[in-house]
Regions:
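Small/polar-rich, solvent-exposed N-terminal microdomains that initiate assembly or binding
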Residues: 1-45, 53
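A generic structural signal for short, non-catalytic loop/turn and secondary-structure boundary residues
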Residues: 31-33, 56, 93-95
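Short, cysteine-centered beta-strand-loop-beta hairpins and adjacent loop/turn segments enriched
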Residues: 47-48, 69-70
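Short, flexible, solvent-exposed loop/turn segments with mixed acidic/basic and small polar residues
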Residues: 49-56, 91
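Oligomerization/assembly interface segments of phage tail-like spikes and tubes
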Residues: 57-69, 96-104
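Acidic-leaning, charged glycine-interspersed low-complexity segments
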Residues: 77-104
Length: 104
């Protein structure tokens, strides 16, 4: 499967979990985001070698779930649907941010 196809598959899963189209892959600063949303980017590529050739590549993504209501169940929903590791939570500009890491 091509890398773009795989990322678009991830994007579709994120949209399904959110229940809207507010997913942003590495958006430029000029993009106006609508909430709740998920902003995500590739953070690392883990390569396994066999006989000095790349055998397996796993891409790690950082996902930031951004939402307004502190009682929103979106973080739980995301953790129920995907294999993610929760890294931290913070509030900025009166918006809640949950940062997750996942391989996809």
């Amino acid at each position: 499967m091509a890398a773009l196809d795989r990322r678009l598959e991830l994007d579709a899963k994120l949209r399904e979990i959110l229940g809207n189209d507010n997913t942003y892959f590495g958006p430029p600063a000029s993009v106006i985001m609508h909430y709740p949303c998920i902003r995500y980017s590739r953070s690392y590529i883990d390569t396994v070698y066999a006989d000095n050739n790349p055998y397996l590549r796993r891409k790690r993504y950082e996902l930031i779930l951004i939402y307004e209501d502190a009682d929103d169940d979106l973080p739980d929903k995301l953790m129920d649907e995907l294999t993610v590791a929760h890294n931290r939570h913070y509030v900025a500009d009166n918006l809640h941010h949950d940062v997750f890491t996942m391989y996809f």
